[in-house]
């Protein structure tokens, strides 16, 4: 269900599902508002998308609530968007449970001011089945929540359980190993506030060479919150987390 260039959008009690399992040939998106404002997604179920089950892109003033995303590559994705609240959702058995991304070379960028709270984010360990070349193809299986190059993000009161790579990852665009030539693009995450979440398990079987190396070096599971350590020159770590 794609909605483009619209205002005052409500998607309520809608189900999208590819019934053949996790296949690269499945459609990319279940629910897909883009370049829109004042969006409410409520009571939605999205299953089996080869990109994102619930995707909101290049939009502003967004609520995603009371919904369930499972067996997608990305369960719920907020991309190049501002002022999003994502709450009271279940993201389970996806490759990555919830993604908050900002990407280059798009008409709208500068993703910021998203809150993710009161969600259940568990067992997001499905092998990545995105078509070759898709940006979500870089997401490791076992990613609970991934923040990529987004600013002013608050993560609180969520339950994270048994996401095998890491429960929360904060990364720059450089982790994708993809070049970009957009002079206005900021590839670094900043001002990420994480508090009052619960964690159980996770980080025990990472699907990423850097995370595997970290796990081996520590001889312990990956910590619940992982930052890739990159930041804009002149910034301090206290300005990131």
PLM features per residue range, with description:
Residues 7-20, 37-50, 60-74, 82-96, ...:
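Right-handed parallel beta-helix
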Residues 1-2, 23-33, 48-55, 71-78, ...:
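Extracellular beta-strand/beta-solenoid scaffold signature
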Residues 176-241:
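Acidic, glycine- and Ser/Thr-rich low-complexity intrinsically disordered tracts
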Residues 160, 166, 170-171, 185, ...:
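Structured C-terminal portions of repeat-based eukaryotic scaffold domains
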Residues 140-142, 150, 165, 189-194, ...:
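Active-site lining segments that contact anionic ligands and/or coordinate catalytic metals
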